[in-house]
Amino acid sequence: MSQPVATLPEELLMEILARVPYRSLCRFRCVSPSWRTLCSNRGLLRRSPQTLAGFFCGTSQNICHLLFLNFPAGRSGQQPLVDPSLPYLHGGGYTHCCGGLLLCKCFTSSPPGVDYVVCNPATEDWTVLPHTEELRPENIILLGFDPADPSCFVAFVIVLDDDNAGEITGVEIYLSETRIWTSKQTGWAQETRVHHYQALNSLFMNGTLHLITKDSSIVTVDTGGKTWRKISRAYPGWECIGQSRRCLHVVDIDHYNDDGFLLSVWVLEDASGNWTLKHTVNLSELI
């Protein structure tokens, strides 16, 4: 007697197929009517990995106002999955982004005030952050999200002392898993300061927030507020930080000679604090 063929629960099957690029999935939509129906499921389409069709950006005049720029290879003439106006937020402005999620502030009329909202522009899912005393524009409010763990996000409030030239006095951390704010006194040295514009270039990697300070060092804090660290700079002035292969990278642009500027890429490959120069290139060669 032959054994019955094992089948997967529909919920599990949808979860698996949602991780397959949609174009690859649709190559098999002629297998059967049920498969064609599955490929036409709008919810599955929204969750499937998409070919990059564009990106959000601010302007030099108003960085809080978002624009959506299409790539030439985008789906020309078709309605985009993402509405760049984010109409469900009912006004407000962009504050920060991380891993495909946006942190926006929305103005409320009753009572008058501001709500901070974390939203996924691809799915139009959004969450209002609970109010806390330090959740205000005078402080630095940042988002942490790892697409490899899409079930949760983190919000950070970098608390500044307005009477002491913006010195950092503490950090408040919100975990979407617990829906609770946790307040921590700063574990960094006194006189640690971060500009608001520098904070926009923050990095969330391996469960840790990275910030460039006014003295061009990098300070870090984990989502539990337990591990605080300062990483010395490898070069006098860093332009931006980022990650590749789960390693911290920094980019510096320095005046090279009469021919132009030199772009340098440094990488921190372990916790030793030693930087390695990976790449250098004259910017004129990239144009």
Predicted regions and their residues:
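N-terminal entry/capping and adjacent linker segments that precede and initiate structured domains
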Residues: 1-287
